[in-house]
Amino acid sequence: MAERLSEEQIAEFKEAFSLFDRDGDGCITTMELGTVMRSLGQNPTEAELQDMVGEVDADGSGTIDFPEFLSLMARKMRDSDSEEEIREAFRVFDKDGNGYISAAELRHVMTNLGEKLTDEEVDEMIKEADCNNDGQVNYEEFVRMMTEK
């Protein structure tokens, strides 16, 4: 995953890693991570810090080394990319830009994609995604629908 990062990104992450690695030993401890996160206005619990370290601690050392840090950053970047793609897709469906996808908007986009759907099929799609039963799909509902496995 880290192999998809540019040299420029890797250099930036090396700089950030050095900020985290307060004692310069080449590893970030949960304590160092906590210090930096608090300086950035975050207030993680000890358990949250351990989870973050554990998420990328491939060698089980209890700390994050630079390759593990790169892996974490690459994953975070990939996650934010897909978030932007979902937002973009929502805008395509939300023709009038009111923050909701109506049955008419869904039918219009699906027809343009070459999908001939009956009114019942469109209504069923809306009903499936519409958690609060207001007859349309808001952004949160759309994200949930798009990210469900």
Swiss-Prot record:
Q: Which UniProt keywords apply?
A: Calcium, Metal-binding, Methylation, Repeat
Q: Where does Ca(2+) 4 bind?
A: D130, N132, D134, Q136, E141
Keyword check for Acetylation: no
Q: Does the keyword Metal-binding apply?
A: yes
N6,N6,N6-trimethyllysine found at: K116
- Detail which positions bind Ca(2+) 2: D57, D59, S61, T63, E68
Q: Which CDD domains match?
A: EFh
The protein's matches in InterPro entries, at most eight in alphabetical order, are given as: CALM/Myosin/TropC-like (IPR050230), EF-hand-dom_pair (IPR011992), EF_Hand_1_Ca_BS (IPR018247), EF_hand_dom (IPR002048)
Q: List the disulfide bonds.
A: none
Q: Which Gene3D superfamilies match?
A: EF-hand (1.10.238.10)
**What residues bind Ca(2+) 3, as annotated?**
D94, D96, N98, Y100, E105
Which SMART domains does the record cross-reference, listed alphabetically? EFh
Q: Which residues bind Ca(2+) 1?
A: D21, D23, D25, C27, E32
Q: Which residues form the EF-hand domain?
A: 8-43, 44-79, 81-116, 117-149
Write down any Gene Ontology CC term: myelin sheath
What domain of life? Eukaryota
What GO MF annotations does this protein's record show? Answer: calcium ion binding
Anything else known: This sequence differs from other calmodulin sequences by at least 13%. Many of the differences are non-conservative and some probably render the first and fourth potential calcium-binding regions nonfunctional. The authors' data suggest that there are at least two different calmodulin genes in the chicken genome, CCM1 and CCL1. Whereas CCL1 is thought to be the primary gene responsible for production of calmodulin, CCM1 codes for the sequence shown and is expressed only in cardiac and skeletal, not smooth, muscle.
Q: Which family does it belong to?
A: Belongs to the calmodulin family.
Return the PANTHER family for the record: CALMODULIN LIKE 3, MYOSIN LIGHT CHAIN 1, 3
Q: What is this protein called?
A: Calmodulin, striated muscle
